[in-house]
Amino acid sequence: MVFSNIKSRSGQKMAIITSFFKDEAYGLLGPQMAATVIEDNTPYDCIVIAVTREAGRTSIKKALVDYFGKERPIIGFSALSGREDLFSLALELKAEGAITILAGPQANVDFVGEQGWQNHPHRFKGLSANFNFGLHGPAEQVIPLLNNLDEDDRSEIPGLLYVDQDGTVNQNTPKDWDEKYLRKVRWDNIYILKRDAIALLNINMGQVLQHIGCPYAARTRATEIDYPVSIESRQAESIKLQLRGCSFCDVAVDKGFYGKLDMETVIDQIRCLPQAQDGRKIPFELINENPLPNLPDLLREVHKQGLKLSQINLTLRADWFISGLQHLRQALPAAAAAGIYVLLSSIGFESFDDTILRNLNKGISVEKNIQAIRLMRQLKEEFPNQIGYSTKEGANHGFIHPTAWDSKETEANIQKTIYLYGLQNDILPPHSTPLIIHHASGLGDWIREIEHREQLWFKRFGSIIGWWESPHHL
């Protein structure tokens, strides 16, 4: 399907551009639910355009021209993964007359810019020049904006960020989450660039939201984070911080922990999932960082409602897997009776060195990680056809490497643990994930404190702080 074949109800159109990985076929709950909210509550038709790093700007702009025709483009940008190519695309489209809106996670801090950038020229200056508006918080906040685009007074639009005529950035307080907007999602509204055209993406993996935010980010914890190894003279020193959640997690700062959604809301989302050829719902990731205590109740309700599921993917911390294991054992026989496969798709191990785990503020130890792995392997022996956990079965567990604290000692500890417990056989992902420091994460505060103390500065790459480069003297 190409854009010119997409029929508009009213001639008013909007698109949401989001970052995507090549050759994947998963859905994107946030942008696709936002597009659904827009279509159901405004005169606008809305699609999601998933853009990989390989996509050429000329191809993207041609697709937008084909979609919008002579209408002024209204384009949202969400979940951009810090991609500077998409930041500059938004700036170019805005200069050409499009209305561009930055939304999704970290929209507020990325629109406003890094803390103290006005007095520190090397810091991320924000994206207020790239976008007409920012929108932080629930997607339905865009409804009054779209219904009043030509109004000058925007002070009553919740969650909106915009620049006054005098250059001042205004931030309106966002509204609370409202579950009536979280019940429905269209999964047939996402498109990709393919052979110089836009094609409908037939997804094979969906998402269902059960928790907003992470329970580990619900409260603040005192922590100490070591200096990076790049500053050799300070290896015995650390920075004291008050952090919510893992130190690298910008979502912990963005959302914290809102809480659990009603079972009815979760079931309504499951109903929206497409069916596979066998009549069952396609596999989905359950968005809940601590899903095991509620899993038996969810499966009972699914059975009560007559829903046919194929596979549930679970993402959680290693310690919460251990503490919730009895609930998983309770749920697996019910899953077996219903023909549902459970995949422990991503356990947040992140490292197998205690120093690095402490600096990541994970709140767990290598011993806990290994205990979880032993229990996962044991569970697989008990329920060989009902549960999966290994990379061969499609799991992709958290493993952050390299980090700012890598040394000969940490490397030796990690390699020893990997080979002692055979982690390369079933746990380690094909590629590790380098430590990424978003400017608004806890580690962003850590970097800025080091810069202040040592009169140094680290290079910024858009919204990301380049910890891997040698620092410069002020």
Regions found by a protein language model. Name each.
Residues I47-D176, D426-P430, A440:
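Glycine-rich beta-alpha loop elements in corrinoid/cobalamin-binding modules
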Residues M1-Y44:
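A short, flexible N-terminal coil/short beta segment enriched in small residues
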Residues G159-V163, V169-P215:
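Extended catalytic-interface subdomain
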Residues S8, K13-D23, G159-D164, V169-T173, ...:
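C-terminal accessory regions of radical SAM enzymes
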Residues A199-M263:
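Canonical Radical SAM [4Fe-4S] cluster-binding loop centered on the CxxxCxxC motif
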Residues K7-S19, I74-G76, I101, K255-N396, ...:
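Conserved SAM/AdoMet-binding glycine-rich loop
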Residues A63-G69, W117-G126, R219-R221, E232-I239, ...:
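Alpha-helix termini
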Residues A34, A63, D85-E92, H120-R123, ...:
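A general structural detector for well-ordered alpha-helical segments in enzyme core domains, enriched
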